[in-house]
Amino acid sequence: MLRFFLACTLLFPCLANAGSDINPASCQRIAMGPGPDDMHLQSLAVPRLIISSHDRRHFRNHGNLYALPLDSLKAGIMARTGEPDGFTLRPHGLDLTQRDGRWWLYVINHDKELFSDQHTLVIYEVVGDTLIFQQELHSPLLTAPNDVAVADNGDIYVTNEREDGASIAEFLFLQRKANVVVYRPQLGWRIAADDLAVANGILIQGNTVWITQTLGEGLRRYQRTSDGRLTQMAQLGNLSLLDSITVRDNGHFLIPAYPSLPNFLLHWQLPGQRSPTKIYDVDPQTGQGSVIFADSGRTISAVSTALAIKDQLYLGQIFDAFVLRCPLPQ
């Protein structure tokens, strides 16, 4: 996500503002920790969001995982138990799954340095308001992980923004080396797909896998093979500068984008500077999208996740310390 921006800031023009279905002035801020980048709905008697939080302006700081009940809208840090000595959590992308009545949370966990190849994937069981540590997966293939998604058979897919997480050259020259890796307990980690331009969001629907790219154009669609590899790639549409991907009730996708990379960089370094954002409603049949939310950055900057729940839209972001809740026209 944010790792590539320094290199590409001067290479892309700012995109023009577009109209939207949602008036940002109608939205409500919900306070929590900095950088609530990713979120997933846990469907309980009282539904709640589980949200990753990390201060990416001070990357070495530890982060937290929050629970946000949708009735009270009061976020709280989730307790964590069983973590090994010396463990530090700097969460990024998440996936939340339910199997046999038990909930499992998969968390991209970053090293203390922005440019590093020492990242991991952490698995917790969610029991009430507590996260019980289960496993931390290490691999040299977790080079610059961004997002994670788990298939029905337990295969774990992770998007990497770069092939070499410690490579500044790959960053500066915008080399098309990003990939998706897959983990299966019997086989370990392997590359599932490559030749991506900053692989970002990932969504699995049965044997179909969707990938967003931040530098590459269009939404990518793949088919899973029996060994977990991704084949039959199709590129749909021409949207670019994309982040995560979620599904609406109508089957369309919600995908945030960054209209101005120079403003994003300024916002990263100077909190008072604003960074515009857009949310696309994307037809998965064509990859074409319409803007349902656009903001100059005055209401929220650098949205990274958009999640629709009934008639409300919840927006996470990369840096600032709140989630935005907006009425969603039906």
Which stretches of residues belong to each language-model region?
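Loop/turn-rich, solvent-exposed surfaces of beta-rich toroidal or solenoidal domains
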Residues: 238-291
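Short, conserved, GDST-rich strand-edge loop motifs in beta-rich repeat architectures
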Residues: 51-61, 107-115, 158-176, 255-274
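Blade-level signature of beta-propeller repeat domains, shared across WD40, Kelch, NHL, RCC1
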Residues: 302-330
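Blade-loop segments of beta-propeller domains
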Residues: 63-99, 105-111
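A short helix->beta-strand "capping" segment at the edge of beta-propeller domains
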Residues: 19-35, 75-79, 287-295
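Asp-box/WD-like beta-propeller blade repeats and closely related beta-sheet repeat scaffolds
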Residues: 86-92, 103-152, 162-166
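Beta-rich, blade/repeat-based domains predominating
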Residues: 33-46, 61, 83-98, 139-156, ...
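Beta-propeller blade signature
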Residues: 63-71, 118-127, 173-185, 273-285
